[in-house]
Amino acid sequence: RQRQMCIRDRAYGRECCMRGLKTYYIKATELRDRFQKAVQRGNTSRVVSSLVKPSCLIVDEVGRCVCDRPCTDLFFDVVDRRYEKEGPNAMVLTSNIAPSGWDEFFTGDDTLLCALDRLFDKASVFVMRGPSYRGRGLDTYSVEAVPQAVKVRGIQPEGM
C-alpha cells in the first residue's frame, strides 16, 4: 500500500532508501491503532520489534491523536530500543505541535519525558515556519446567490 508522505518526509525517506537503508513510514494515528490492537491481541513485543527493525522510522503527524497509557508505554519502548540499537537507527517525527505540547496527547507520568530525552539526545531538529504550500495551485471561484428567481423572456421559473 503506497502512503502519501509530506515532501520533507518523502525526501528523507527516499534518501535513506537510496543509501540502502530499510525505511518505514507510518502516521501517528495508524501507530496508535497498531499499538491498541497489539495490546488486545497480546503481541506487543512483535509489533515493537517490527518498528525497531527498520534503519529509519518516520512517524508523521505526532500529536494529532491521543494515546492512552499502554500506547504511550509502547511508544517509549520503540524509542528506547531504537536508541539502544546498534547501527543506523534514525527516527523522523513530524508535527505541527511543538514537543512541549505533546504531553496533551501522550498519557503517562514521565514516560513521554523519558522518550523525548532519548529522541533529542542525538537529534537534529528542523523547525519550519511559514505559509503552507498545500492548495497553492487551487482555482478559486466566487459565486453570488440571486435573492429571488426572476421571469426571463416569458419563461416562468418552476414553483412560481
Task: List where the protein language model places each region.
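Post-Walker A helix-loop "phosphate-sensing" segment adjacent to the P-loop in P-loop NTPases
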Residues: 13-26
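Hydrophobic positions on the alpha1 helix immediately C-terminal to the Walker A/P-loop
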Residues: 8, 12
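Short, small-residue-biased leader/transition segments that mark boundaries at the very start
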Residues: 2-7
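Short, surface-exposed recognition loops or helix-turn segments adjacent to catalytic cores
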Residues: 1, 26-30
